[in-house]
Amino acid sequence: KADVFIFLDNVKVEKSSWQMRNRLKTITNKEDGEVWFRIPTKNIHSDTKINEVIIDNSVNWKHKHKTIFENNYGEKFPDIKFLNKIYDKDWNKLVDFNIEFIEKCCEFLKIKTELKKASSLNAEGKKSNLLLNLCLELSATHYLSTIGAKNYLEKDKNLFKSNDIKIIYHEYKHPIYKQKGKKFISNLSILDLLFNENMNAVNIFNSK
C-alpha cells in the first residue's frame, strides 16, 4: 500500500523489542509451541538510539539461529538462499542486519516499496512531530500507520490535517498458510511463512 517505507532508525530503542528478537514455531511429540530467537546486544542505555545498538558477537548467535532453523524446519532452511548469505556476513550494528534482512525479504516477496532511513533525512522532532516532518519532507499526502500508534496519533491528528496529510490505520489481516503441526500459530517471524511456503509465499503475502 505504501509508496515509501521509512525505517525509524534514529529514535530510542526499547529493550526486548522486535528489533532484537522474534518467534518461530516448534513441534514436539506432545504439542506445537514457540521459540524465541534473538540477537544479543551490548550495553543499551535509556538514550540509546536504534542505529547505535551494537551486536554482541562474543555470543555465537548466528550458530544458535541456524540450529533453531534446522531443528524446526529441517531441509527447508537452505531453500531461502538470501538468508544463508546474510548469516555468512559479519555484522556490527543491529540496524544494518535488520535493514538488509527486510530488504532481502522484500525482494523475495516482490515488494517494490521504496525504503528509506529516517537518519538519512532532515526531519526532526519526537513522536507525531517527527512523523509529520518526515511526511512533509517527502511531500506525502497520506500517512499509513500501524494500529498500535493510534493512541498518540489521534491526539495530534489536527497537525496532520492542517498540513493536508490524511492518517490511515493499517489493520493487518493475518493470512492462513501451510504450517507444520496440529494448530496454526499466527504472528510469527516472516521466516515461518518463507520456510513453509517458499516461492508460494509471494502469492500468499500479496493476496492480503
Q: Where do the model's predicted regions map?
A:
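Residues lining hydrophobic/aromatic ligand-binding pockets adjacent to catalytic sites
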Residues: 1-208
